[in-house]
Curated annotation (Swiss-Prot):
One of its GO terms (cellular component) is cytoplasm. Gene3D superfamilies: Anticodon-binding domain (3.40.50.800), Bira Bifunctional Protein, Domain 2 (3.30.930.10). Homodimer. GO terms for biological process: histidyl-tRNA aminoacylation. The keyword Nucleotide-binding applies. Pfam families: HGTP_anticodon (PF03129), tRNA-synt_His (PF13393). Belongs to the class-II aminoacyl-tRNA synthetase family. NCBIfam families: hisS. This is Histidine--tRNA ligase. It catalyses: tRNA(His) + L-histidine + ATP = L-histidyl-tRNA(His) + AMP + diphosphate + H(+). Its EC number is 6.1.1.21. It comes from Aeromonas hydrophila subsp. hydrophila (strain ATCC 7966 / DSM 30187 / BCRC 13018 / CCUG 14551 / JCM 1027 / KCTC 2358 / NCIMB 9240 / NCTC 8049). It comes from the Bacteria. The keyword Nucleotide-binding applies.
């Protein structure tokens, strides 16, 4: 027997039993972003490597450790996309979508990072992202957060997520703060863990994000970024907080929240949860007003967020909030007796014409009545339609309810269509 080939570690199959939950999540995401005026954009999963180096930053963990990078046959360095914002900006610049325009775009699809696989974190993962270009006030930051808040309400997880906010100010303000932070950390260099020592000079703000308890204790006395912010940056942040408060959205200010990508400025936010064990981030985003220019476009204000869909699905399953998922099959058509197969397939197509949303499975592969009913029950259908020789002769169909106590009945095909239509409303 040939050796079995398995999926790559950290890259998972989504099986038919799992797909309905994903489809429900995707449906809600699409409905909500459409209600806010966003349009879908689809980008390739492979990009030139230097796109991510320029956008994310060469000294970030993503670029240094996590990207899947390879040379193609022409010797060009290509990478599987580790996130969606850089690709979305590249597409907007390339196709002239951003200059002097307000653009609202969203995307959904697989991303790739070579991380250690663990619960809710995979090497191929799916991300839902929303990006807005052309508006630079705190009002659009607030609206994006309101959009995510609406999603949590629709998914039923509002009580299980917490909004954390921070502001990173402008690049010049961060530069002054970086100098002060490095000067402070140098006093404790020997006490820092290896990762923080490495980051101290290459990307010192990331030290604030360290999970090491000793490092966190050292940071208690560190300079505050807020003390280095100018009036405009502080006013932007205060404006955002006022809008969130007026909308009834609770938040926590987390001055250690810096995000792992270099392109952010001003507003950054994360929605975090404790429902998956250790605190995990479900959704994160912020402003990146300099990224479009950094990638070759005209100066364009921008803000966006992304959420990990695996984590969202895992939350719904963990909290048992996926019980209203529609089964894959609504109705199972059983055909019993001589000459019923041809009539059965004609009936099935008639039902699909009349009821396009009906999920109808026709029995195939032969078998007696008992076997067909067993398959009908296993399919998850609520109703079995039974077409026997008598039903074919009389132009009727027998309706058997597989879930609940309703009595079996034999009706005309038109009556069956009306009954199924009423149940689907």
């Amino acid at each position: 027997m040939a050796k079995q080939i398995q999926a790559i570690r950290g890259m998972n199959d989504c099986l038919p039993e799992q797909s309905p939950v994903w489809q429900k999540v995707e449906q809600i995401l699409r409905q909500v972003v459409a209600s806010y005026g966003y349009s879908e954009v689809r980008m390739p999963i492979v990009e030139q490597t230097h796109l991510f180096k320029r956008a994310i930053g060469e000294v970030t963990d993503v670029v240094e450790k996590e990207m899947y990078t390879f040379e193609d046959r022409n010797g060009d360095s290509l990478s599987l996309r580790p996130e969606g914002t850089a690709s979305c900006v590249r597409a907007g610049i390339e196709h002239g979508l951003l200059y002097n325009q307000e653009r609202r775009m969203w995307y959904m699809g697989p991303m790739f990072r070579h991380e250690r696989p663990q619960k809710g974190r995979y090497r191929q993962f799916h991300q839902f992202g929303v990006e807005l270009f052309g508006i630079n006030g705190p009002d659009i930051d607030a609206e994006l957060i309101m959009l995510t808040h609406r999603l949590w309400r629709l998914f039923g997880i509002s009580e299980h997520v917490t909004l954390q906010l921070n502001t990173l100010g402008q690049s010049s303000e961060r530069a002054a703060y970086r100098d002060a932070l490095v000067a402070y950390l140098e006093q404790y260099k020997d006490q820092l863990d290896e990762e923080s020592q490495r980051r101290m000079y290459s990307n010192p703000l990331r030290v604030l994000d360290s999970k090491d308890e000793k490092v966190q204790a050292i940071l208690v006395g560190a300079p505050r970024l807020f003390d280095h912010l100018g009036e405009e940056s502080l006013a932007h942040f205060e404006g955002l907080k006022r809008l969130l408060e007026s909308a009834g959205i609770q938040y926590e200010v987390n001055e250690r929240l810096v995000r792992g990508l270099d392109y952010y400025n001003l507003t950054v936010f994360e929605w975090v949860t404790n429902s998956l064990g250790a605190q995990g981030t479900v959704c994160a985003g912020g402003r990146y007003d300099g990224l479009v220019e950094q990638l070759g476009g005209q100066p364009t204000p921008a803000v966006g967020f992304a959420m990990g869909m695996e984590r969202l699905v895992l939350m719904l399953e963990t909290l048992e909030l996926n019980g209203d998922i529609r089964p894959a099959v609504d109705v199972y058509l059983a055909m019993v007796g001589e000459g019923t197969e041809q009539a059965g397939f004609q009936l099935a197509e008639r039902l699909r014409d009349a009821l396009p949303d009906l999920r109808l499975m026709s029995h195939c592969g032969g078998g007696n009545f008992k076997k067909q009913l067993k398959r009908a029950d296993k399919s998850g259908a609520a109703i079995a339609l039974i077409l026997g020789e008598t039903e074919v002769q009389n132009g009727e169909i027998t309706i058997k309810y597989l879930r609940g106590q309703a009595e079996q009945q034999t009706v005309t095909v038109d009556a069956a269509i009306a009954l199924l239509a009423a149940k689907g409303e």
